Amino acid sequence: MASYASEVKKELTSLEVHPEHAKAELAAFLRMNGVLNLHDHQFSLDITTENPAIARRIFKLIKVAYGIEPLLIVSRKMKLKKNNQYLVRLNQQVQEILENLQIWDTEKGLVTRIPKRIMSSREGAMSYLRGAFLAGGSVNNPETSRYHLEIYSTYEDHNEDLAKLMNEYFYLNAKMTKRRRGYIVYLKEAEKIGDFLHIVGALNAMLNFEDLRIMRDMRNSVNRLVNCDTANMKKTASASAKQVEDIQLIQKEKGLDDLSEKLQILANFRLAHPELTLKEVADQIPDGPISKSGVNHRFKKLHEIAESLRE
């Protein structure tokens, strides 16, 4: 059974590739997952994934953005996992493409920050975030887990830029933290996770997420009400048991006839109805209805009498 995150990524990979946005999405893939090789004085760039839909997406992004068809190599992992492994290899115009995407600088080498042209464009930011999520993102199933969406990045400054895109353009309240050999930017608020899914184009996943979130919140609300009712019932039962105990002691030691009329009425009513709450006693007592505070005052009087008999 596919994970929730896999379903989200499946939807994203099925989106149409727009020529004007392809480079921003591709830049995220290459910056986060690309491996640069040098053989016989020639550069090649590899991106490896176990997700065939993501491999096809990368292939199409390169073709749309630069008119080049990269190699697509499929191999089978023979160890513990038996999933196919998909390698997209670019071996034409590698340096030119990396420079065009501002991933490589001839003087500085690898550029890990997100280019200003993407940082300054809302549409570019949306496409880059889509690529970043496909390259290194995950999201928990809102039905079974705590709310959590994250994107992993090797470089701290790249992680900072991802958070900046999320917060300055889309107000997602993204947070950052170190994770093993890299960094993550993450979201914990259900509403913000839904917003992110909408931003990157996973509309069906967003609607599904919202449905699951609403159902989960409703279940939690019902559980809270049930727990509250249970606690109140226990509290009522405990208070009633103590009141009955006081009345039975008075009845045994001196009899209820010795009490004032109001206390007699309450004592007999409580013995007959130990299950009632304080409010129900106040509403249903034969000489009532009276206020809860009035009933409580009478019970205190009975308790004082019982305590004097215990001494």
Swiss-Prot record:
Pfam families assigned: HTH_WhiA (PF02650), LAGLIDADG_WhiA (PF14527), WhiA_N (PF10298)
Gene Ontology biological process terms, A to Z: cell division; regulation of sporulation
DNA-binding region residue numbers: 277-311
Cell division in keyword set: yes
A GO molecular-function descriptor: DNA binding
Coiled-coil spans in chain: none
InterPro entries to which the protein is assigned, alphabetical: Homing_endonucl (IPR027434), Sporu_reg_WhiA_N_dom (IPR018478), Sporulation_regulator_WhiA (IPR003802), Sporulation_regulator_WhiA_C (IPR023054), WhiA_LAGLIDADG_dom (IPR039518)
Keywords: Cell cycle, Cell division, DNA-binding
Taxonomy, superkingdom: Bacteria
Entry function: Involved in cell division and chromosome segregation.
Family assignment from sequence similarity: Belongs to the WhiA family.
Name assigned to this protein: Probable cell division protein WhiA
Organism whose genome encodes this protein: Lactobacillus acidophilus (strain ATCC 700396 / NCK56 / N2 / NCFM)
Gene label: whiA
